[in-house]
Amino acid sequence: MKIYWAFDLISPYAYLGLKQMPRLPAGTEVELVPTLFGVVLNHHGQLGPAEIGPKRRFTYRFVVWRARQMGVPFRMPPVHPFNCLNAMRLVAAVGSSHEVVETAFDFVFGQGRDVTDPAVLAELGQVLGIPDVNAALNDPAVKQALRASTEWSIQRGVFGVPTYIAGDELFWGHDAFDMLVDYLRDPQGFDDEAMRRVDSLPVGVTRSRVTHP
C-alpha cells in the first residue's frame, strides 16, 4: 500500500518518527511530503507545542527521553523553534527522497546543527549535494513546489507534523505509529461500530478562542 508522510524539519517528533519507518509492514511504499508546519498552524488557527511554555518544556524533555529509549542519536539545535524555511527549500530542491530527508533530519536533530546560520545552511546544502545553495533557495520552482506540497497536506486534513496519510485516514504524531501499523495490517478493524460512533460524536460545548499574552 502507498502511504504519505507529512513532515517539517522543525519537528523533533518527525525526526523520531522517521527512525521508526523500518518497522512498517513489508510492501508499504512511503512518499515523503514537505509540509510547512507554520502554514498548517495558521490555517487551523492553532498554536504550536513550543508556543505554550509548560508544553514546550515537556516536549523537549520527552523527545530527549524518547530518543534515549529508541537508541538514536539526538541533540536539540541551539534554538527552537527556529525558522527552517530555507532548510525545507533545500530538501524540496533535491526531491525529498527518504535518503535526503533522513540526511537533513540527522543534521538538525542528530547533530543539533543551527540551520538558521547561513554558513551551516550552506554546509547542509553541500551534504545534500546542492552545488549552488543560493540558486536553490531562490528558485521559483522550488518555492512553488514547497507551497504546493504544503497545500496538498492541508487539503488532506493534516493539522500537525508528522502525519501519516493512509487512504482517508490520518495518523498524527510519531506516537501514532503503532496505530498506523495496525491499520495497514487490518483496515477493517478501523471501521467497526466503536470507530464509527466516535466519528459522528456530537459536540457538547464550544468555547471562544482566547489570545493569551
Question: For the regions a protein language model found, what residue spans apply to each?
Answer:
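Structural alpha/beta surface segment adjacent to cysteine/selenocysteine redox centers
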Residues: 13-111, 194-213
